[in-house]
């Protein structure tokens, strides 16, 4: 992915889903550049939370934690992710998807996009953080991520999948359930 003018707009720099302030949003956008994540994830299945955003938000959290301390990172990242995920699972349309399907398309898309945002920007970073704890901490997770991003790519399907991540961690989907 490439930075463009949209990354420097007031709206983008104040997006609290990407960081606690403009500087942290810039960290988020630069992390996208670092990993080249836009090309590493298959975005065709929007129903799963595994995406460039989840890993980017997690990585931003790690940088912010190192820079501003664990308390700041907990308050401005982990606690906010958890609150959003808790609210997600209480959401009427998540609990009653048939009602969502009955809405007019424009409303359905707006709600679906909002719900997808929570899964990608909040649920996935929490799952990666849980994986970090289960594999033995930050250094272990750093080794796993380094291995995943330096892996031999399959030219037929070069994307990093959630199953690739789980396999590298020695975990299952059930291990990362947040309930």
Task: Name what the model sees in each region.
Residues 1:
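Active-site-proximal or metal-binding-adjacent scaffold patches in catalytic folds
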Residues 4-89:
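Zinc-dependent metallopeptidase catalytic helix centered on the HExxH motif
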Residues 26-28, 96-103, 133-137, 149-150:
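Short hydrophobic/aromatic-rich motifs at helix boundaries and adjacent loops
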Residues 33, 37, 66, 88-96, ...:
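A short secondary-structure junction motif
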Residues 64, 86-95, 158-164, 178:
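Short, charged low-complexity intrinsically disordered segments located at boundaries
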Residues 71, 107-110, 114-179:
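Amphipathic alpha-helical substructures
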Residues 92-114:
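The feature captures the short pre-catalytic strand/loop hairpin that immediately precedes
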């Amino acid at each position: 992915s490439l930075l463009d003018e949209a990354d420097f707009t007031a709206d983008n720099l104040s997006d609290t889903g990407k960081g606690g302030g403009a500087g942290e949003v810039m960290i988020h956008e630069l992390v996208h550049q670092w990993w080249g994540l836009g090309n590493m994830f298959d975005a065709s299945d929007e129903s799963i939370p595994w995406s460039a955003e989840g890993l980017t938000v997690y990585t931003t959290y790690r940088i912010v934690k190192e820079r501003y301390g664990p308390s700041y990172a907990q308050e401005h990242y982990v606690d906010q992710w958890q609150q959003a995920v808790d609210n997600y699972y209480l959401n009427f349309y998540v609990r009653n998807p048939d009602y969502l399907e009955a809405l007019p398309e424009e409303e359905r898309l707006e709600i679906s996009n909002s719900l997808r945002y929570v899964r990608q920007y909040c649920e996935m970073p929490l799952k990666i953080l849980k994986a970090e704890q289960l594999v033995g901490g930050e250094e272990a997770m750093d080794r796993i991520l380094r291995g995943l991003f330096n892996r031999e790519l399959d030219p037929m399907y070069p994307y990093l999948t959630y199953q690739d991540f789980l396999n590298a961690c020695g975990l299952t989907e059930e291990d990362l359930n947040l309930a």
